[in-house]
Amino acid sequence: EMCIRDRPDSEDETFEGIDLLDPTKLVPEELAEVVLVGKLTLDRNPTDYFAETEQVAFHTGHLVPGIEITNDPLMQARMFSYLDTQLTRLGGPNFAQLPINCPHAAVNDNLRDGMHQTAIHQGMAPYKPNTVDDDQPELATEAEGAYVHLPREVSGPKVRANPVSFDDHFSQATLFWRSMSQVEQAHIVEAYTFELSKLFEKPIRERVLGVLANVDAELCARVAAGLGLPAPEGDPARGVVPSPALSQVTTEVGPVAGRVVGVVAGPGADLAGIGRLRKAVEAKGAVLHVVAQVGGELTKGRAKETVERTFLATRSIEYDAVVVAAGTVANDPRLVVLLQEVFRHCKALGAWGDGAAVLEAAGIDTSAPGVVLGDSVAKPFTADLLTALGRHRAWDRAV
């Protein structure tokens, strides 16, 4: 879904006391709601990585009439740096003529020659004004769809200084921390503790803790405990109202289209059950991969399944959920690693029949949230698995 947030244009360029030109500040969604204006649909992937990915030229100055940039100094700098980057990366100003960057309308400018120039221009004067070509080409008018800058009045002294809001270094960090769920806060603490553990200079660790103390006392104390250091006192911002919209953790069940389910199977696995699970998963737009010790095909009676991944050549990062089929034997340490990683990353896990014994042999707590068990691949089992998959992660497992 494509959404925007609309705020009134004020002379002081602030909203609810927040400086809109300060890139270190954000406006909580609770103060300026998100408005749905349409949907952007990605209908295909690149087919040529070089032509369509390496040569793409993003540029903040690629605007349609009616949209202008603000006086944000960071944005102003990006207007220069993006163009400068494309000139360097793609060999000159004609990057708009590369197929991936070419607009639907023909490129019609005064740029001549150089790398990537594909047009054969008529006339003698690639500039204006001129006399030799009767002052042509003529600039497009607003009626013809040209980009027009709206006139704006500018006044006041120009100084090399930042607005006073730039001196507030901590209130929005405090807002962010206090808006996180328990599991997100745990991730933040672990991230700080991990990175600071790589610092071998104790004074630097202590200085960072001093900064965190001004964000939130609990955050500082938890990181300090992980480092084995005392937590200093700080002065966190007061009266900060959390913004639940900042949290990415949700209890809602989302769509599963495009997600990948790995089904672990052995030579004696229930292939008919795998077939039923595949049908249920693919009906929702998800993908199922059979994972086994060796490649090739698994056969049992009339049922047949192709092995898409092997224990040697796969890792948990490829899957949003992993299910162990009945009839599978846990006799490979690589399978144990796969299952433990999926469990540790709070992804959905499942098993039917004696496949549950494989989870238990890997040290998986089968009563934990997001672990789905069943006697067979019946509707209740597939429904519970798709629900767990739609929740993305079983975050309760990490708290």
Model-inferred region functions:
Residues M2-I4:
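Short, small-residue-biased leader/transition segments that mark boundaries at the very start
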Residues H345-W352:
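ADP-ribose/adenylate-binding Rossmann-like module
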Residues P163, Q182, A186, E190-R344, ...:
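Extended, subdomain-level signal for the structured scaffold at the beginning of enzyme domains
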Residues N45, D354-G355:
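Short, loop-centered acidic/histidine patches that primarily coordinate divalent metals
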Residues D6-G254:
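Charged, compositionally biased interaction regions
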